[in-house]
Amino acid sequence: MVLAGLLITPPPRNAAPATAAAPASAAANWTVETGTLGFTVKQMTAEVKGQFTGWTATIAYDESTRTGTVDVTIPIAGMTVGSVTPQAAGPEFFDMAKFPTATFTGTIAETNGQLTATGPLTIHGTAAPISLPFALTITGDTAQMKGQVTIDRRTFGIGANYKDETTVAFPVQIDVTLTAKRK
């Protein structure tokens, strides 16, 4: 997956040349090479695992300050949940026709030795704050990340007609892993 780069508009004709601005930080941009974005939810008494493909991430991270930003776009059409994929993509759950993407925009910071990406997760047209704790290992120009967070599907109106946890549980565990290269 390719990260989005900066778009620089050239100065208008006959304008004085622009001077280069000093970089805002030492944050490096990272290109995601491989990754998985999965989720687990209980349906009746069984765990159901699903995943999203085709997602993209724009990541800037400064190793010296252990801070950064991340923007993730997730196409709901890339969701697979086994035999229940059509139902999960339908109006009762993700309503892919009306809400074709989910997004996460986060700020990365370290607190008490734990890296966390914090910001709004938008699913099904509803934004709610989440904090995704993650482990990060950087070797040379390669970063490996692994994180997990649990959300409540009701917060996002997913399966709103399933008000009883015995059919579809309220908690949904989200797991993300990725390998990225420094640009």
Question: What kind of feature is each model-predicted range?
Answer:
Residues 4-183:
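Low-complexity, acidic/polar, glycine-enriched regions of mature
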